[in-house]
Design a protein with these regions (language model features):
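N-terminal helical cap/lid subdomain that shapes the substrate entry/recognition surface
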Residues: 2-101
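Conserved Rossmann-like nucleotide-cofactor binding loop
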Residues: 12, 19, 124-125, 182
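Short glycine/proline-centered loop/turn elements that form peptide/ligand docking sites
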Residues: 13, 105-109, 181-184
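Glycine-rich, phosphate-binding/catalytic loops in enzymes
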Residues: 21-25, 134-136, 162
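Short acidic capping loops at alpha-helix termini that bridge into adjacent secondary structure
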Residues: 35, 81, 138-142, 170-174
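Substrate-recognition element of Asp-dependent hydrolases with the DxDx(T/V) motif
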Residues: 84-85, 92-96, 103-134, 140-146, ...
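Conserved Lys-Pro-Asp/Glu-containing loop-to-beta segment of HAD-superfamily phosphomonoesterases
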Residues: 152-185
Length: 185
Protein backbone atom coordinates (compact mmCIF):
# COMPACT_ATOMS: atom_id res chain seq x y z
CA UNK A 1 0.00 0.00 0.00
CA UNK A 2 1.35 3.41 -0.95
CA UNK A 3 2.24 5.55 2.07
CA UNK A 4 4.83 7.89 0.56
CA UNK A 5 4.99 10.04 -2.54
CA UNK A 6 8.29 11.41 -3.79
CA UNK A 7 7.71 14.38 -6.08
CA UNK A 8 10.21 15.71 -8.55
CA UNK A 9 10.12 19.50 -8.44
CA UNK A 10 11.07 20.92 -11.84
CA UNK A 11 8.51 20.44 -14.59
CA UNK A 12 6.41 18.35 -12.20
CA UNK A 13 5.22 20.83 -9.56
CA UNK A 14 7.03 23.99 -10.62
CA UNK A 15 7.31 25.39 -14.13
CA UNK A 16 11.08 25.28 -14.52
CA UNK A 17 10.98 26.39 -18.15
CA UNK A 18 9.28 29.64 -17.16
CA UNK A 19 11.74 30.24 -14.31
CA UNK A 20 14.66 29.36 -16.58
CA UNK A 21 13.49 31.72 -19.32
CA UNK A 22 13.18 34.59 -16.85
CA UNK A 23 16.57 33.93 -15.25
CA UNK A 24 18.35 33.42 -18.57
CA UNK A 25 16.85 36.57 -20.10
CA UNK A 26 17.83 38.60 -17.03
CA UNK A 27 21.38 37.21 -17.09
CA UNK A 28 21.82 37.88 -20.81
CA UNK A 29 20.59 41.46 -20.43
CA UNK A 30 22.93 41.87 -17.45
CA UNK A 31 25.93 41.06 -19.66
CA UNK A 32 24.69 43.17 -22.57
CA UNK A 33 23.21 40.47 -24.82
CA UNK A 34 19.66 40.81 -26.09
CA UNK A 35 17.79 37.56 -25.32
CA UNK A 36 16.46 36.96 -28.82
CA UNK A 37 14.63 33.79 -29.78
CA UNK A 38 17.72 32.67 -31.70
CA UNK A 39 20.04 33.14 -28.69
CA UNK A 40 17.60 31.42 -26.31
CA UNK A 41 17.14 28.53 -28.75
CA UNK A 42 20.88 28.04 -29.12
CA UNK A 43 21.36 28.15 -25.35
CA UNK A 44 18.65 25.50 -25.00
CA UNK A 45 20.41 23.18 -27.48
CA UNK A 46 23.74 23.58 -25.71
CA UNK A 47 22.19 23.18 -22.28
CA UNK A 48 20.34 19.96 -23.19
CA UNK A 49 23.48 18.43 -24.67
CA UNK A 50 25.47 19.28 -21.54
CA UNK A 51 22.88 17.75 -19.17
CA UNK A 52 22.85 14.56 -21.27
CA UNK A 53 26.59 14.33 -20.76
CA UNK A 54 26.03 14.65 -17.01
CA UNK A 55 23.47 11.82 -17.10
CA UNK A 56 26.08 9.69 -18.88
CA UNK A 57 28.64 10.51 -16.19
CA UNK A 58 30.87 12.44 -18.61
CA UNK A 59 30.56 15.87 -16.98
CA UNK A 60 30.13 17.10 -13.43
CA UNK A 61 27.28 19.40 -12.45
CA UNK A 62 29.68 22.36 -12.25
CA UNK A 63 31.12 21.55 -15.67
CA UNK A 64 27.59 21.55 -17.11
CA UNK A 65 26.76 24.89 -15.52
CA UNK A 66 29.85 26.66 -16.78
CA UNK A 67 30.49 24.94 -20.13
CA UNK A 68 27.06 25.87 -21.47
CA UNK A 69 27.97 29.55 -21.10
CA UNK A 70 31.53 29.09 -22.33
CA UNK A 71 30.18 27.58 -25.55
CA UNK A 72 27.39 30.15 -25.97
CA UNK A 73 29.63 33.12 -25.21
CA UNK A 74 32.30 31.85 -27.63
CA UNK A 75 29.69 31.55 -30.39
CA UNK A 76 28.33 35.04 -29.64
CA UNK A 77 31.77 36.62 -29.30
CA UNK A 78 31.02 37.66 -25.72
CA UNK A 79 33.90 38.10 -23.30
CA UNK A 80 32.33 37.30 -19.92
CA UNK A 81 33.18 34.86 -17.16
CA UNK A 82 31.12 31.66 -17.32
CA UNK A 83 31.45 31.34 -13.53
CA UNK A 84 30.04 34.84 -13.00
CA UNK A 85 27.24 34.21 -15.50
CA UNK A 86 26.39 30.99 -13.67
CA UNK A 87 26.26 32.76 -10.31
CA UNK A 88 24.05 35.56 -11.66
CA UNK A 89 21.75 33.11 -13.45
CA UNK A 90 21.34 30.93 -10.36
CA UNK A 91 20.58 33.96 -8.21
CA UNK A 92 17.88 34.99 -10.67
CA UNK A 93 16.57 31.42 -10.92
CA UNK A 94 16.27 31.08 -7.15
CA UNK A 95 13.98 34.11 -6.91
CA UNK A 96 10.90 32.73 -8.68
CA UNK A 97 9.07 29.45 -8.30
CA UNK A 98 6.26 29.52 -10.84
CA UNK A 99 3.67 26.84 -10.15
CA UNK A 100 1.66 24.94 -12.70
CA UNK A 101 -2.05 25.83 -12.52
CA UNK A 102 -3.18 22.74 -10.56
CA UNK A 103 -0.16 22.32 -8.27
CA UNK A 104 -1.88 23.61 -5.11
CA UNK A 105 -5.07 21.66 -5.82
CA UNK A 106 -3.05 18.46 -6.25
CA UNK A 107 -1.00 18.99 -3.09
CA UNK A 108 -4.04 19.88 -0.99
CA UNK A 109 -5.82 16.75 -2.22
CA UNK A 110 -2.90 14.48 -1.27
CA UNK A 111 -1.70 16.27 1.88
CA UNK A 112 -2.62 14.34 5.01
CA UNK A 113 -3.37 11.18 3.03
CA UNK A 114 0.27 10.46 2.17
CA UNK A 115 3.68 11.43 3.45
CA UNK A 116 5.07 13.64 0.72
CA UNK A 117 8.67 14.51 -0.08
CA UNK A 118 10.49 16.45 -2.75
CA UNK A 119 13.35 14.84 -4.67
CA UNK A 120 15.31 17.12 -6.98
CA UNK A 121 18.45 17.27 -9.07
CA UNK A 122 18.40 21.07 -8.84
CA UNK A 123 20.89 23.03 -6.76
CA UNK A 124 20.17 23.47 -3.04
CA UNK A 125 20.16 27.27 -3.00
CA UNK A 126 18.12 27.53 -6.17
CA UNK A 127 15.49 25.02 -5.07
CA UNK A 128 15.24 26.50 -1.56
CA UNK A 129 14.53 29.93 -3.04
CA UNK A 130 12.00 28.64 -5.54
CA UNK A 131 10.19 26.62 -2.87
CA UNK A 132 10.06 29.66 -0.58
CA UNK A 133 8.69 31.84 -3.38
CA UNK A 134 6.04 29.31 -4.40
CA UNK A 135 4.95 28.56 -0.83
CA UNK A 136 4.54 24.82 -1.46
CA UNK A 137 7.24 23.67 0.96
CA UNK A 138 4.65 23.38 3.74
CA UNK A 139 3.12 20.33 2.06
CA UNK A 140 6.28 18.24 2.34
CA UNK A 141 7.89 16.36 5.20
CA UNK A 142 11.39 16.66 3.75
CA UNK A 143 13.30 17.80 0.71
CA UNK A 144 16.07 15.72 -0.84
CA UNK A 145 18.44 17.53 -3.18
CA UNK A 146 21.02 15.64 -5.22
CA UNK A 147 23.66 18.27 -4.46
CA UNK A 148 23.27 17.48 -0.73
CA UNK A 149 23.09 13.74 -1.35
CA UNK A 150 26.26 13.69 -3.41
CA UNK A 151 24.44 11.67 -6.07
CA UNK A 152 21.99 12.42 -8.87
CA UNK A 153 18.51 10.98 -9.32
CA UNK A 154 17.73 8.29 -10.26
CA UNK A 155 20.87 6.62 -8.94
CA UNK A 156 20.66 4.01 -6.22
CA UNK A 157 22.96 6.19 -4.10
CA UNK A 158 20.50 9.08 -4.22
CA UNK A 159 17.58 6.96 -3.05
CA UNK A 160 19.72 5.26 -0.40
CA UNK A 161 20.44 8.77 0.90
CA UNK A 162 16.70 9.55 1.04
CA UNK A 163 15.77 6.28 2.74
CA UNK A 164 18.68 6.63 5.15
CA UNK A 165 17.57 10.07 6.27
CA UNK A 166 13.93 9.08 6.64
CA UNK A 167 13.59 5.46 7.79
CA UNK A 168 9.80 5.65 7.53
CA UNK A 169 10.18 5.71 3.75
CA UNK A 170 10.02 2.10 2.60
CA UNK A 171 10.64 1.40 -1.08
CA UNK A 172 7.67 -0.96 -1.37
CA UNK A 173 5.34 1.72 0.05
CA UNK A 174 6.61 4.56 -2.12
CA UNK A 175 5.88 5.99 -5.56
CA UNK A 176 7.79 8.68 -7.37
CA UNK A 177 6.13 11.23 -9.59
CA UNK A 178 8.28 13.03 -12.12
CA UNK A 179 8.49 14.18 -15.70
CA UNK A 180 11.52 12.20 -16.90
CA UNK A 181 12.24 8.49 -17.09
CA UNK A 182 15.98 9.19 -17.37
CA UNK A 183 16.45 11.74 -14.60
CA UNK A 184 13.67 10.94 -12.12
CA UNK A 185 12.77 7.27 -12.00
Amino acid sequence: MVQNILFDLDETLLDFKRSESRALSNMLRHIGVEPTEKVISRYSEINKSRWKLLEQGLLTRQQVKESRYEILFAELGVDYSAAEATAYYEDQLSQKGFMFPDTIKLLETLHGRYRMYIVSNGGSNVQSGRLADSGIGKYFEDIFISEDAGAEKPSREFFDYCFGRRPEIKADETVIIGDSLTSDI
